Amino acid sequence: MDLQNPAAAWRRRDALRILAACMADWWLPRNLFAQKSSVPRKRDRRVIVVTFGGGVRYEDTLARDGWVNIPHLASDIVPQGLVYPSARHEGLTGHFNSTGALVTGSRQNVDAYGSEAPVTPTIFELFRKEHSLPPEEAWLIATNKSFGLMGGSKLRAFGDPYSANVVLPKQLLISTIKAAVSTNSGPGVEDRKALAERMMLALDEGYEGFGWRVFESDRVLSADLKASLAKSLLDYFNDPASPTSGDELTFFMAKEIMNRFAPSLLVVNFWDIDIAHYGAYSLYLEAIRRTDRLVHELWQHVQASPKYRDRTTLLVVPEMGRDSDVAGNGFANHRSGDESCRRVWLVAVGAGVPKGAGTERPIRTLDVAPTVAQLLGFKMAECEGRPLAELT
């Protein structure tokens, strides 16, 4: 035990006890020795869904040898919440269709590069329509630039009037800096050449290149709001001390949206992990650790905000896995459809979540959307998934 910090030692011991069950044949029965957090009224409830976008293998994260890559989840978040180690992704293992299944509760089969919207209603549309909510109540902040149409389906009774506000921070920054460096020097862009070079270095860290087409929904941000968000992003980017990976930009924008609007429904897509396609295992693990840190910092931001503290449920889930070394192409890909591509996990923490608990009950990523519906008090009867009883 750490005699200088006994509380930290006990937290580590608790985390090891809980996570060790992921390697055993048993798990804590639901609610056994678990104390649920207080549950706010539905109208006061807030839900944040965060994806380990790009896909991560179970063995590199929640398996015992993977804990070193998710130290904050393992030591800081899991002991406060509930973990499902036996989650499964069903359906296609591309990014758009995988995350599409998360936000609709139904398997999707549309263009993998984001030129088509989901074919079934999203949580954003159903939430806003049933409660007659303004667009400021539902947001999607995504590192993946192909997610421009993820905020809503094209169904006649839903679609753009009820879809989420979608912000792609990397793309917003690209367009902002391109506009800035094409004008005369001014505040924030004194050295246009240096700014452009820094943009190229920072924004080319991810797997997708500048040539990828970005598809935009007809539900667009107002010019004033877009300009205001772009100014904040540019100010952040201009600070030499600011980290500038795609996920760092997404994290900054998520906090900005939370501070300005305090939306009831927020989905955050981190995606630096997909750098694994380059075949560098060290970069893949570095991105996992970055995502783990950003999830923890986001949860700390929730706890520091009076509008979110004690009324927010955070759900953290990989959008899918990645190939195994034996049956697939290894960590670098996610197209084999083998079990390593499909086995994932889910961690929940916050309002209404049992503390320090877990269940070996198999669940599906399709269950995330109807669980969000139950938490926020709207109907989602037509999807394939089912609400997670432990959380609702």
Predicted segments — roles?
Residues 97-104, 333-376:
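Substrate-binding rim/cap in mid-to-C-terminal beta-strand-loop elements of soluble/periplasmic
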Residues 47-49, 283, 290-332, 372:
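Metal-dependent active-site segment of extracytoplasmic phospho-/sulfohydrolases and closely related
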Residues 58, 64, 152-154, 227-238, ...:
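Active-site His/acidic residue clusters
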Residues 26-80:
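Active-site-proximal N-terminal segment of extracellular/periplasmic enzymes that hydrolyze or transfer
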Residues 60-95, 137-139, 359:
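Short, structured active-site-proximal loop/turn typified by the sulfatase FGly-forming signature C/S-X-P-X-R
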Residues 1-10:
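N-terminal secretory signal peptides
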Residues 10-28, 32:
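N-terminal export leaders
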Residues 124-129, 361-389:
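Non-catalytic, well-ordered alpha-helical segments in soluble enzyme domains
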